């Protein structure tokens, strides 16, 4: 290893970040958190030694930055291989178009669109209420503690949302928060938190989830309602005509041409096409939303 050994925790973290350059930002955040948590715990456990001495002491147990980075890359590759569904042979034409029904991510992304209305309302209410109470209580002695607790809860919610997005879309999201470092003093930590752009981008994400959740929910529900009603229209007509469930009588639609015999098969075909398009749309929305969430919730890889 040509690089000189780190003499401080900051140097170690910088070297580890450089070794992980180009990797997923969520992976980098997890690796940096684990390393900083371990290193600071070891330094605290040896108050009689300097950081340089502690780093030299644990070099053989925890590893150099390049060794740690390699271990994280190997572990990530194994986890991704285990979690990723087997890749099917590429299809073309109708196979590629209708093959979306065999993609589990299309279904989970559609479920995410339906769930987003509930999570959007919860996140928006949480963010707006927290900010309003923080501003209202700012003149009181409990104002600052309340704001700090609210910010801490915001990061917990952010981490939970990341896990939900990873489960629904497959996009890698952080499994660890960003380490708060070793800022000296209470006010230094507060200032560090306020200067962290993620503090504000996370709040922006939580607030934006309400309009996004409404849009996702409306598109999913309307798309499902129209496509499924078209698909099942012939079955409903047959049931009404033959009285399979104890009711007889034909259905009549307006305008009159909808009552033609050839319309029902066309409606069923249109429903299948609309449902297929909805599944493609849901999968695309899932991917785009995961990129949007990662941009706002994950710490940038550049320090």
How would you name each of these model-derived features?
Residues 179, 251-264, 271, 276-303:
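Cytosolic/matrix-facing juxtamembrane and C-terminal tails of multi-pass cellular membrane proteins
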Residues 163-190, 245-249, 294-303:
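Juxtamembrane inter-helical linkers in multi-pass membrane proteins
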Residues 133-170, 272-280:
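Hydrophobic alpha-helical membrane-embedded segments
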Residues 231-259:
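Membrane-interfacial helical/loop segments at transmembrane boundaries in membrane proteins
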Residues 100-131, 164, 189-224, 231, ...:
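Short, structured motif recognition centered on aromatic/hydrophobic residues
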Residues 2-3, 44-112, 173-198:
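Cytosolic juxtamembrane regions of integral membrane proteins
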């Amino acid at each position: 290893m040509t690089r000189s050994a780190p003499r401080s925790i900051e140097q170690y973290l910088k070297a580890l970040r450089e070794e992980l350059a180009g990797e997923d930002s969520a992976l980098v955040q997890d690796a940096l958190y684990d390393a900083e948590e371990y290193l600071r715990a070891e330094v605290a456990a040896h108050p009689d030694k300097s950081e340089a001495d502690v780093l030299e002491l644990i070099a053989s147990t925890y590893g150099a930055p390049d060794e740690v980075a390699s271990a994280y890359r190997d572990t990530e590759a194994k986890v991704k291989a285990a979690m990723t569904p087997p890749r099917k042979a590429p299809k073309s034409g109708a196979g590629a178009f209708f093959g979306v029904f065999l993609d589990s991510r299309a279904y989970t992304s559609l479920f995410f669109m339906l769930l987003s209305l509930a999570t959007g309302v919860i996140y928006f209410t949480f963010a707006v209420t927290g900010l309003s109470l923080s501003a209202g209580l700012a003149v009181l002695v409990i104002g600052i503690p309340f704001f700090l607790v609210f910010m801490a809860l915001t990061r917990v919610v952010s981490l939970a949302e990341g896990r939900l997005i990873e489960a629904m879309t497959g996009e890698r999201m952080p499994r660890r928060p960003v380490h708060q470092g070793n800022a000296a003093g209470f006010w230094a930590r507060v200032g560090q938190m306020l200067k962290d752009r993620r503090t504000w981008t996370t709040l922006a994400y939580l607030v934006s989830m309400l309009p996004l959740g409404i849009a996702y929910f409306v598109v999913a529900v309307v798309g499902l309602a129209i496509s499924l009603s078209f698909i099942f229209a012939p079955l409903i007509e047959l049931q009404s005509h033959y009285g399979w469930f104890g009711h007889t009588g034909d259905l009549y639609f307006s305008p009159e041409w909808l009552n033609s015999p050839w319309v029902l098969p066309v409606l069923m075909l249109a429903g299948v096409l609309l449902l297929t398009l909805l599944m493609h749309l849901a999968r695309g929305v899932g991917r785009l939303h995961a990129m949007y969430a990662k941009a706002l919730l994950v710490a940038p890889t550049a320090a």
